[in-house]
Amino acid sequence: MKQYLDLCQRIVDQGVWVENERTGKRCLTVINADLTYDVGNNQFPLVTTRKSFWKAAVAELLGYIRGYDNAADFRQLGTKTWDANANLNQAWLNNPYRKGEDDMGRVYGVQGRAWAKPDGGHIDQLKKIVDDLSRGVDDRGEILNFYNPGEFHMGCLRPCMYSHHFSLLGDTLYLNSTQRSCDVPLGLNFNMVQVYVFLALMAQITGKKPGLAYHKIVNAHIYQDQLELMRDVQLKREPFPAPQFHINPKIKTLQDLETWVTLDDFDVTGYQFHDPIQYPFSV
């Protein structure tokens, strides 16, 4: 929690104002932030200085793992995080590749599970990684990549957290996740949970021990309409100790994650938190 608050304070103190063309808003911005999560010792990085809704973050991750491309599927899992980008983004609404209501296009999990090959067919990046790690293989390229510039025009949003690189040292699994851009008051709350849970899940279904998850953010920013709440409310609060995250031990395989797993298979204990803060969201 301290590293999260340190980043927020750094942006407030050292950030530079940048005009964001996509949203039409100003952002207070810093370049490069590195966060580390101790998954092996179950130090769950859930924000405590405001109430955080971890279930939606896990549901979104499950949707990525399943390769979903429709906001309705994400809602069925338990999150509305894609409703706005799928249905309120004017550029996407005018895009000829949009298939209709709730369609997200070829974003995130679609790239992870069905990356289009130039000679036809698709590559299932995630399955390859799971198969390798399950056999104890680390080819130094166990990388799940969502960033496909050749298909940006076919999706409602470029990926923000675009790369997850898994590494084995003995029987301990590590993760390096890279994020090009982060709305720190809103998005980072989700992204920290997802990086942590992704390593925990991958370790469980490949029979490895989870180690550390490293989370790099390139452009970390606070939107102008979020600044007052961050500076004058959230940063004035004292954080609580980290809670713990629990996964149903019956989850054994990638197929389990693809089929029967729901939010009921996850739990958080020991979570103390301050009152919620309603930060504005920028589409």
From Swiss-Prot:
Record InterPro entries: Thymidate_synth/dCMP_Mease (IPR045097), Thymidate_synth/dCMP_Mease_dom (IPR023451), Thymidate_synth/dCMP_Mease_sf (IPR036926), Thymidylate_synthase (IPR000398), Thymidylate_synthase_AS (IPR020940)
Catalytic activity: dUMP + (6R)-5,10-methylene-5,6,7,8-tetrahydrofolate = 7,8-dihydrofolate + dTMP
GO cellular component: cytosol
Main location group: cytoplasm
Residues reported to bind (6R)-5,10-methylene-5,6,7,8-tetrahydrofolate: 183, 282
Tagged with keyword Methyltransferase: yes
rRNA processing keyword on record: no
UniProt cross-references to PANTHER family, sorted A to Z: THYMIDYLATE SYNTHASE, THYMIDYLATE SYNTHASE 1
Quaternary structure and partners: Homodimer.
Name recorded for this polypeptide: Thymidylate synthase
Originating organism: Vibrio cholerae serotype O1 (strain ATCC 39541 / Classical Ogawa 395 / O395)
